[in-house]
Amino acid sequence: MGEVGTFALVALVGLLTFAFVASAVSGVARGIHWLSNINMVLAIVLAVFVFVLGPTVLILNLLPTTIADYSAQLATMSGRTAASAGDDTASWLSSWTIFYWAWWVSWTPFVGMFLARISRGRTIRQFVVGVIVIPTSVSLVWFAVFGGSAIGVQRDGTDVASQSSTEGQLFGMLDHLPLAGVSTVLVMVLVALFFVSGADAASLVMGTLSERGTRHPSKRIVVFWGTLTGGTAALILWTGGTDALQGLQTMTIIAAAPFLLVMIGLCVSLYRDVSRDPLIVGPTKESEHERVSDTL
């Protein structure tokens, strides 16, 4: 199969833009909620499929081992820089650790506000469990299933690691499992749905910011931001190809770097706010004294 042309990619961007704009306009309780549930069901189906038809015993053996190794090396790996090893490690760190963290910084305004929107009424404990503990646990299992399957295929003599991209490695691994055609289609559907469910949340947040923090931005504002986002990607892709789009991603991350200072300020603000919350601090000495005086 030959390489997909620019026109086909632009058409795909247009189709996905229409999908996430329609989802965003329908609101959190309808389209976004519906798509998110479909995403999770299909992801579970895919993970179970790979776990059952792949090297199940190897995956079960890798799961506790990798989690223990990850926990033991987390601090070391978090502080690792290019000075710790050679050029290959430096290249990997720049493309994964640094780039990936910077990418999440650029998504912080959208993800943070959207999580705050859907978490209204939850306790801090519920928020931490739902946003940090559960996603982290699911991610560990997910990487163990797919990483273990790829390792199993590699051990069997098929060199999937030599594929030029991570996408090629994924599809190369799926090709060695039964029903490869079905799983390949399922992966592509999942990628599209996860993109739509992320972009519709971003459109909704930009609409909220444009209307001074309202919880229900007008549909025309949401459509405007969604169309502008998709149109910008399509225009850059049409004029400069995938290289230009990657350049835009890099520029976005660089522009988002100053937001690290805002994130630090938000952490300090959250700590101060929580430390003064009456439900956490409890009654002050003054209020206790007043209560004792009233009793007497």
Spell out what each predicted region is.
Residues 1-10, 43-49, 112-137, 199-225:
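Helix-loop-helix connectors at the membrane interface of multi-pass transporters/channels
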Residues 6-23, 56-57, 75-83, 87-119, ...:
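Hydrophobic, membrane-embedded alpha-helices of multi-pass small-molecule transporters
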Residues 20-32, 52-64, 87-91, 111-124, ...:
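Transmembrane helix-loop junctions in multi-pass membrane proteins
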Residues 72-90, 147-181:
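Membrane-interface interhelical connector segments
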Residues 44-83, 146-151, 263-276:
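Hydrophobic alpha-helical segments and their helix-loop junctions in multi-pass secondary transporters
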Residues 2-26, 45-46, 101-113, 219-234, ...:
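Transmembrane alpha-helical segments of multi-pass small-molecule transport proteins
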